[in-house]
Amino acid sequence: MVTERQNEILNLIIDIFTKTHEPVGSKALQDSINSSSATIRNDMAALEKQGLLEKAHTSSGRKPSVAGFQYFVKHSLSFDRLAENELYEVIKAFDHEFFNLEDILQQAADLLAKLSGCTVVALDVEPSRQRLTAFDIVVLSQHTALAVFTLDESNTITSQFMIPRNFLREDLDRLKALVQERFLGQTVLDIHYKIRTEIPQIIQRYFTTTDNVIHLFEHIFGDIFKENVIVSGKVGLLNFSDLKAYQFFDDSQKVAFEIRDSLAEDQMQSVRVADSRESCLSDLTIISSKFLIPYRGFGILAVIGPVNLDYQRVVSQVNVINRVLTMKLTDFYRYLSSNHYEVH
């Protein structure tokens, strides 16, 4: 069992070590701990025996172990602090007009990567929860067309496709009518289910020749089932991890699954220390935090860094960016839902 004084010593060692990355001796703690050097050494020995501290090879001092960082996160980390000293920089970074959601999320990820020195991932609302609110087909040439999807009245996705040889122009109109009749207002998850169950049963009502229609559906709808993953500071991974971790972030769908897996449905924040099931991330820390996207749901900001990062500083940075990001998104979606021509 960790005593109150031992917990104070562990917290202080973590604070010093994450700033200096040097082993900490008892003398460095005496100014902050109201105990003798011998007492502090005994407590450090007790913490080492419990696996929360470990010896350094090049010094007589001690450094936190992985278990020590995990204990700190569970018992001492404050999740509601704001990095007030960086608030002005964050507000200034968002103080201009954005033209789409992706640019706003990219700005948040870039800024957090810059402030934290870590790799950052930003995710939109989970695709399966988004609703199809508009659909159109634009003919590009004699043989190609573009399917245009609008999700949640704000997120536009396009899918270019080759018009099947047996398709007439009227068939494209029928395809558009079928989607608008059956899918508008439905969640992406429901659409995914209907393409596999309902659509094969009813396409003969719309098409005289049904060859390739199901394959065409699967092709043009494929992109709306995929996560839009924004990654910033990826090269920084190589400062504290290896090439396998770097390459992991090339697979955006695996990245999205890993980040979403780090947060339970009812969790707003999570800090996982060396706890990933992905072997290439198993010695890293993942700090995840949900942020509100008005009218639509929650996105996620995640920081991927070394185990020995300054947890309190990074969590505070995530909090302040989340707060300013939510304010910016509120303005953005308020504008989208307003009359464009109204006088302000």
UniProtKB/Swiss-Prot annotation:
Molecular function terms from GO: DNA binding
InterPro entries: GAF-like_dom_sf, HrcA, HrcA_C, WH-like_DNA-bd_sf, WH_DNA-bd_sf, WHTH_HrcA_DNA-bd, WHTH_transcript_rep_HrcA_IDD
Entry keyword Transferase: no
Family: Belongs to the HrcA family.
Protein name: Heat-inducible transcription repressor HrcA
One of the GO BP terms on file: negative regulation of DNA-templated transcription
Keywords: Repressor, Stress response, Transcription, Transcription regulation
Signal peptide residues on this chain, from the entry's feature table: none
General function of this protein: Negative regulator of class I heat shock genes (grpE-dnaK-dnaJ and groELS operons). Prevents heat-shock induction of these operons.
Pfam families named in the record: HrcA (PF01628), HrcA_DNA-bdg (PF03444)
NCBIfam families documented for this protein: hrcA
Keyword Transcription regulation: yes
